[in-house]
UniProtKB/Swiss-Prot annotation:
One of its GO terms (biological process) is viral translational frameshifting. Capsid protein (CA) is the structural component of the virus-like particle (VLP), forming the shell that encapsulates the retrotransposons dimeric RNA genome. This is Transposon Ty4-H Gag polyprotein. Residues 403-413 have a biased composition (Low complexity). The lineage of its organism: Eukaryota, Fungi, Dikarya, Ascomycota, Saccharomycotina. It comes from Saccharomyces cerevisiae (strain ATCC 204508 / S288c). Residues 39-115 form a coiled coil. Residues 380-413 are annotated as: Disordered.
Amino acid sequence: MATPVRDETRNVIDDNISARIQSKVKTNDTVRQTPSSLRKVSIKDEQVKQYQRNLNRFKTILNGLKAEEEKLSETDDIQMLAEKLLKLGETIDKVENRIVDLVEKIQLLETNENNNILHEHIDATGTYYLFDTLTSTNKRFYPKDCVFDYRTNNVENIPILLNNFKKFIKKYQFDDVFENDIIEIDPRENEILCKIIKEGLGESLDIMNTNTTDIFRIIDGLKNKYRSLHGRDVRIRAWEKVLVDTTCRNSALLMNKLQKLVLMEKWIFSKCCQDCPNLKDYLQEAIMGTLHESLRNSVKQRLYNIPHNVGINHEEFLINTVIETVIDLSPIADDQIENSCMYCKSVFHCSINCKKKPNRELRPDSTNFSKTYYLQGAQRQQQLKSSAKRTKVLEQDTKKVKQSVQQQKTGNY
């Protein structure tokens, strides 16, 4: 029997070649026994039917290969036998690769069908959503009663929304859709992520593409909307409004403010720029620029003495260092210290360091802080006057006593 040509042998499937390949074509009998799965099999895609027809056709070709192998084993020509066995070995390797590829395609289609059946069943009766991820072979579960707890109607809070969304999907082990190398995810996972992020969008927040079912388009729409309203000049003014000195009395509010400014900058840049060293240096310079000179040196000293924890971002480490320094240097609660700046109402610095302070000497009663010390000085001056008056009266009384004693001595003489 003539040896099949190369193009034919590439499509040959031999279900007797190896037990490993035979095991892959077995189907899940348990799933096929269910009524729902039977309905799915009855309307199986035409591509699967074509795969099955190819399997039957390949068996016929395989019989010819077996007959060829038997004839080779009966010949006395050792050299010819070796050459043809070598060619058959190469053909078998190609056939095995083709078999593995074909079987994987069949299994993938059947797995998708079984997953759809399972998803429909869980959606109807279960308490969670089932989905697949690119980063794990195990299925993930997202509780139906879980709600994304951040909601905003303000475009200025889009960076906070995206940052909280990133933390939220990491908690429930979704694929990180903010990574550069992830450009497509499982449709089921995409559907759930769209549901989650839309829970955080208020009705009055007019953002393009929020009605789409593509999570990547929603994220890009949010970022583009934010960029259009927050150019470089707007961001620079936002940094310049913040000034922190050693009198800061609300460290929690300060942390939220600095975090918001950092997120404002990070979400302006593309994915590839967010881990760029230049961005790290830029953010460090911006954060240090918010510190008054009375606080800046202490923060620099602390940064020098404390090594950076590689487990957190550089800007997060820098903000934590600023907050720790502020807490250590913040004044003890006292009625004599003003609660907020009289010029800009900020709780991060005192009036004397404010950028809006006019270039003139403050009147004694212009602020509570100055007025207190003015009153204390007036009281001290009054005390000194009273003391001087008592001393003068005492001197006059002493003089009168001396004169009286002198008169008595003169009379005796």
